[in-house]
Structure formats: C-alpha cells, structure tokens
Curated annotation (Swiss-Prot):
Tissue specificity remark: Widely expressed. Expressed in erythrocytes.
Protein name in UniProt: Fructosamine-3-kinase
GO biological process, one term: protein deglycation
Role summary: Fructosamine-3-kinase involved in protein deglycation by mediating phosphorylation of fructoselysine residues on glycated proteins, to generate fructoselysine-3 phosphate. Fructoselysine-3 phosphate adducts are unstable and decompose under physiological conditions. Involved in intracellular deglycation in erythrocytes. Involved in the response to oxidative stress by mediating deglycation of NFE2L2/NRF2, glycation impairing NFE2L2/NRF2 function. Also able to phosphorylate psicosamines and ribulosamines.
Signal peptide: none
Organism the protein comes from: Homo sapiens
Amino acid sequence: MEQLLRAELRTATLRAFGGPGAGCISEGRAYDTDAGPVFVKVNRRTQARQMFEGEVASLEALRSTGLVRVPRPMKVIDLPGGGAAFVMEHLKMKSLSSQASKLGEQMADLHLYNQKLREKLKEEENTVGRRGEGAEPQYVDKFGFHTVTCCGFIPQVNEWQDDWPTFFARHRLQAQLDLIEKDYADREARELWSRLQVKIPDLFCGLEIVPALLHGDLWSGNVAEDDVGPIIYDPASFYGHSEFELAIALMFGGFPRSFFTAYHRKIPKAPGFDQRLLLYQLFNYLNHWNHFGREYRSPSLGTMRRLLK
C-alpha cells in the first residue's frame, strides 16, 4: 500500500510514525510526506469508498462554517483487492479535557449556524436590493444531507424531508429496525416498534425545529483537543434536530460536565427534552445492535418500553 500512497500523494517521503491505530470500523496510520504529516484511514469493506466519501462531505460541510475544527480531508484512494484509504490532515491530538467547555460553545454555535442564516435571509427579504449570491452560505430549509453518510459502516439515507419527525422515524429508526428484522427477526422489537412509531409525533408537539448541521456521531472517541483548541472528527453529518447530537454524548460518558453546561448556556433545554433524548438514544442502541450484536438488544428494547410508558 505504501507504493500506492507514494504515487497518489506524489511524495518521495513516506515514513510511518507512531503506532498503527484501530478504531471500531477502520484502521489508521500517520505518515510523514514531502508536504507534511498526514493520517491515513484504511477500510477493506466493499462500501469503503462510499463511507469515506460521506466522511469527506461531512468534514467539508463542518469546515465551511468556520465554527469547529476538523481535520482537512485530502483524498480517497481505491485499494487493490477492494476497500479504500482516506488521507487527511494529521493533527496531534489528546483526549478532551481542558477544552471541553470551549467545545460545548462551539457545538452550540454550529447548531445555531443555519438558524442564523435563516434570520439573515429574512432580514434581506425585507431590504430593498438584490440578495447576495454565489459563494455565500445558504440557509437549508429541509432535513437530510446531499449525500449518503455512514454511522459506523451502515449507510444512512439522507433524502431531504420537510419535517423532522418523518425524517428521523423513516431514515434513522425504521432503517435500523429493518436491518434488525433482516438479521434477527426479533418479534419483540417488531411489536414494540409498531406501538412506538405512532407516538413519535407526540414528542414534538409545539416544538419548532430549525434544521441544524450536525456532526452526527459525537461520542467521546470522536472528539479531542490539542494546544490550539478542541477538534472533532469521524463525522456522519446531516441537517437534523440539534438535540440528536447530545444523545450519544450522554450515553457513553467521556464528556466533562463543563461541555454540557457551556452548550446549554447557548441552547437551553426545550420542554420534553428528556423524553426526546431517550428517542435519540434508541437510534444509537439500535445502531450498536446492528454493529456489535445482541448485547445491545436489551438496552434497545428497554428504551422502547420506557418511551411507551
């Protein structure tokens, strides 16, 4: 593979440093090159290119806001024999600690970004003269994303929808439960879902949801910091409800309390927050069931039962 990387990156220098890393889904390694250090993720699955292209699109969308720091994506390379490699900027990272509060502020600003574009658009509509066009960021008025993204290795359909409950029920929960039905034919999951899906709209009564650009998989393994500030990576972005972002962050720990305090200082909890958080955590339990097996069956079904009480 190193010969392929040299050719694709047009570098004479290609020297691995640090140890090889293995995440839940892909393997990774850092290299020195003529143009500086890079980090290369490798995945041998047949859908690896699609997975990495979704990550590139996510990183580019997050980067374009200027509000959060992410590794700069560079290139996706097809590998002989199947799979792909994804080359990105190398950042010397350590676990999130002193920068947690700053990250909370930045994530809130990210989630408010599209709403502020909407406010700007309304102001311009009330102003005589032509509205700015071209490279200016545009308000996104629907839920979804312009391409498929993968949360783990599972592709997520991001077809645009006008309302959030429909998008979330169809393209997140139903999609995960379809996979569970295919692989496990779990009768109890099927029965609980048939009762739960009709109740989902009730959790959003009276709530205005402006599409927010999300990281999409914000657990502690996808956040870090360096001497400059906080960093987020491995996104599966889409435009959705800002509360969705917090579900996995609260599920598995690793985020200091200061992160949530700083976040909610800018975006206070709306009525019904805790019940919706359960709904969003259900997605993550189902996704883990599909990735890692039956040990996540019990929390998945338990969460559905709690939502039905």
